[in-house]
């Protein structure tokens, strides 16, 4: 048998959704990419369980802390705002940025046999992540795929969910 779903009304705002609910309840979240009527996108992170609300709130808190740590390093932290609904629910709202991940750029260097380009990017990465390394906050997931290089060459940390005080 076949099944069909027909949606009527305005187009849904959510264009992508990922559930990260294979984690402990205190870290279970849903990440949505939304697009408004003008085509502007944003990323929203919601707690998937009541226990994960603090984890979502920490994304906002660590945006500020990482911004202080990496200020002047050339590594920008994707802006985050915290929203609350009338029922007290929380949501972290991040910019939707476009560009290429550092992972894609490094892979391309390897595919093209560009060892010099690879080394240059890797050393720049090391310089940026070591900046103020004694600062009492660390992102344990500061991987190549979480750094987006935009069309103007700016390095942006787009996901810093796994940041903790040291």
Task: Provide a role label for each language-model segment.
Residues 77-122:
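Conserved structural core of kinase catalytic domains
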Residues 62-72, 109-140, 145:
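Conserved kinase catalytic-core helix
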Residues 25-67:
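ATP-binding glycine-rich loop module of kinase domains
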Residues 1-34:
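Rossmann-like AdoMet/SAM-dependent catalytic core
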Residues 136-166:
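Catalytic activation segment of kinase domains across protein kinase-like and atypical kinase folds
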Residues 41-42, 90, 153-155:
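Hydrophobic residues embedded in beta-strands of well-ordered beta-sheets
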Residues 35-38, 82-88, 151:
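Short, ordered beta-strand-loop transition motifs
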Residues 11-12, 48-51, 83-87, 97-102, ...:
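Short, solvent-exposed loop/turn segments at secondary-structure junctions
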